[in-house]
Amino acid sequence: MDIRQVTETIAMIEEQNFDIRTITMGISLLDCIDPDINRAAEKIYQKITTKAANLVAVGDEIAAELGIPIVNKRVSVTPISLIGAATDATDYVVLAKALDKAAKEIGVDFIGGFSALVQKGYQKGDEILINSIPRALTETDKVCSSVNIGSTKSGINMTAVADMGRIIKETANLSDMGAAKLVVFANAVEDNPFMAGAFHGVGEADVIINVGVSGPGVVKRALEKVRGQSFDVVAETVKKTAFKITRIGQLVGQMASERLGVEFGIVDLSLAPTPAVGDSVARVLEEMGLETVGTHGTTAALALLNDQVKKGGVMACNQVGGLSGAFIPVSEDEGMIAAVQNGSLNLEKLEAMTAICSVGLDMIAIPEDTPAETIAAMIADEAAIGVINMKTTAVRIIPKGREGDMIEFGGLLGTAPVMKVNGASSVDFISRGGQIPAPIHSFKN
């Protein structure tokens, strides 16, 4: 490595807000299944605190050694609906509390996996888990929840969509932060290191390390050097920058897996913003020539960014996965917040951008009087984009306050302006229930 590359890396960290967003340890809880829910909770606590005992210490050690901030250390676990189904319990809050207790004991920031996979219907534990979500997220601090309601192979479970509209409302009514820790997916992935949607898939190894990186500030600085040049140059610049970012992510992941004695899983090729100035995906899109994100051309700019990040990342690391798409969470990106406030970015444009990125309606505040059926219809729209286009899409939406208010979440979750929602009713549409069938092009066998 020549001196120029060394100084570039130092600048990425000191001036351009580059960091490793998360080291996430995935832990299988299948061997914790027990017909007694309290025994299951104890087994869960013991396994997590044993397997992840050194996760935070190792993360801090690597950060100090390399001089690269590692912002979050997290744990993801087997979807709890699978564990709870073996019991006769009528709610799974006790399992959520076991997760929370374990997370606090080992010192991680979040623990994900209070989850259910219901894309084609409910099994015994699924409905119980879904109805437990409001209390589980209210009575815990670090637990995150996700529900997969659709897939390209299965279609969209509209009964579950309707239920999740209600659950999001109930969660927001019980807790200021609860809905910010709840994601509804289509085509959810099993190796996602990012919260709130992380869970440990049943096809994964017993314990695994996945890494998520963050580098929109680095990409923006690189694009500042090629202002006015063609999109060919822009694409090449993004690709080369993504290569460097991913290389560092791979190094951190491999070091962590070696020191913890577990398998290295994947690097998630996602650009994850923060509320800090200089760490915004929106500002990257504007650097390509948009006056403000949300104007015409935004979706095309996002497409270029997303694709070139993947091309550069795949060259840098063999093992890539997770969501691997630019994140556009409104409350967590100062450029997105500004665009909503100046009127150029609305829910409809964010829905269009979902066709490109992984989580379209992410960390969005909407009026608290929005009907549950309208929230469900938003979920259905996002799921349809994912199911038809064979990609992951998701909704993380917070019904709080009135249009124009600012909702403060703090920390990495930032501040969300309450956005306008279409007032026309979707009640009759959502009340049908049942299943939207899988698209014809899903029939591959």
Swiss-Prot record:
Q: Name one Pfam family in it.
A: DUF711
Q: Which SUPFAM superfamilies match?
A: PFL-like glycyl radical enzymes
Subunit structure as annotated in this protein's UniProt entry: Homodimer.
| Cited PANTHER family | UPF0210 PROTEIN MJ1665 (PTHR37560:SF1), UPF0210 PROTEIN SPR0218 (PTHR37560)
Q: Which family does it belong to?
A: Belongs to the UPF0210 family.
Q: What protein name does the entry list?
A: UPF0210 protein SP70585_0294
